[in-house]
Amino acid sequence: MAKLTKRMRVIREKVDATKQYDINEAISLLKELATAKFVESVDVAVNLGIDARKSDQNVRGATVLPHGTGRSVRVAVFTQGANAEAAKAAGAELVGMEDLAEQIKKGEMNFDVVIASPDAMRVVGQLGQVLGPRGLMPNPKVGTVTPNVAEAVKNAKAGQVRYRNDKNGIIHTTIGKVDFDADKLKENLEALLVALKKAKPSQAKGVYIKKVSISTTMGAGVAVDQAGLSASAN
């Protein structure tokens, strides 16, 4: 049996894997146990009551967290004309059409989010094999294919998170950094849960949000008691 590291021993002693913690207690635990030499992200895993094998029950979308994610996001936009000027004014680092596609084909991918206006998808479509595996392919379901590219850029910069359930029906995303105030992490989590509820497939039966766990980049998951969250989120 592998020997537990000192860090993992401390986590096991502090975190009761069978308990659901009040959100404030859960955040305090994460802050106490975050001892990495960098500012860890706070990640969330939400177990949904869906059948992930059925396409009509899959959950996918995006929402802007009220306090952002703490990450600096570089945005590339495929568009032209007045939209190109609007995208630049909104803060996009890279804006173009065929010229931007050529950069990407050469492996120049210094960006975190790709946005496209509908008329640019003929160009973006050639990049599916490059952008797709990295989760960067623009998609109207998450607001990254849109005629209003300026708004999409602002959302990305403001701390928009994208979510999509995995094959087990679990959503994994981030809600901030461990050095955020506890109230900000709580409000970000509540905003995410509200967005997930709005995205509930009509075919999903029974309990929809079954379990919510939060963790830091290097830490263990802490289950959250949903009763301690705002009424709109639980």
From Swiss-Prot:
Coiled coil: none
Superkingdom of the organism of origin: Bacteria
GO biological process: regulation of translation; translation
InterPro entries to which the protein is assigned, alphabetical: Ribosom_uL1_bac-type, Ribosomal_uL1, Ribosomal_uL1-like, Ribosomal_uL1/biogenesis, Ribosomal_uL1_3-a/b-sand, Ribosomal_uL1_CS
Keywords: Repressor, Ribonucleoprotein, Ribosomal protein, RNA-binding, rRNA-binding, Translation regulation, tRNA-binding
A GO MF label: rRNA binding
GO cellular component: cytosolic large ribosomal subunit
One Pfam family it belongs to: Ribosomal_L1
Primary role: Binds directly to 23S rRNA. The L1 stalk is quite mobile in the ribosome, and is involved in E site tRNA release. Protein L1 is also a translational repressor protein, it controls the translation of the L11 operon by binding to its mRNA.
NCBIfam families per UniProt: rplA_bact (TIGR01169)
PANTHER family xrefs: 54S RIBOSOMAL PROTEIN L1, MITOCHONDRIAL, LARGE RIBOSOMAL SUBUNIT PROTEIN UL1M
Subunit structure: Part of the 50S ribosomal subunit.
Family membership noted in the UniProt record: Belongs to the universal ribosomal protein uL1 family.
Entry protein name: Large ribosomal subunit protein uL1
The organism's taxonomic lineage, starting at the top: Bacteria, Pseudomonadati, Pseudomonadota, Gammaproteobacteria, Enterobacterales
